[in-house]
Amino acid sequence: MAKPSKTTTKKKVKKTVVDGIAHIHASFNNTIVTITDRQGNTLSWATAGGSGFRGSRKSTPFAAQVAAERAGQAAQEYGLKNLDVEVKGPGPGRESAVRALNNVGYKITNITDVTPIPHNGCRPPKKRRV
């Protein structure tokens, strides 16, 4: 019986990125953390729902903290050191996600709020009666 030929594959070399942008989308129901390079190419991402939190626990500051830690640790493979943070949305996980990225070991250079503000656009949802 013939021996199977060994195929040599080149190991994919990860590019090194020093500066990046952390996009934190904090809605009322979930928090999405995406870390990109300066051009906007995604390096890593994590969500509160994908981090094991379901239902109402998904919309907690602790879930946002865990999601930010997971995204930050995954992006460290690229040699990332400095982050600009762009926060979007009114969710409860805004500050805790930024704090978690700082605790992972990134130097946060500036924090920007990029929440879209309508010039009297769509009608907002009605107020909750609890």
From Swiss-Prot:
InterPro entries referenced in this protein's UniProt entry, alphabetically: Ribosomal_uS11 (IPR001971), Ribosomal_uS11_bac-type (IPR019981), Ribosomal_uS11_CS (IPR018102), Ribosomal_uS11_sf (IPR036967)
Xref: SUPFAM superfamilies: Translational machinery components
Keywords in alphabetical order: Ribonucleoprotein, Ribosomal protein, RNA-binding, rRNA-binding
Biological process per Gene Ontology, one example term: translation
Cited Gene3D superfamilies: Ribosomal protein S11
GO CC, alphabetical: ribonucleoprotein complex; ribosome
Family from the record: Belongs to the universal ribosomal protein uS11 family.
Main function: Located on the platform of the 30S subunit, it bridges several disparate RNA helices of the 16S rRNA. Forms part of the Shine-Dalgarno cleft in the 70S ribosome.
Protein name listed in UniProt: Small ribosomal subunit protein uS11
Provenance organism: Teredinibacter turnerae (strain ATCC 39867 / T7901)
Gene name per UniProt: rpsK
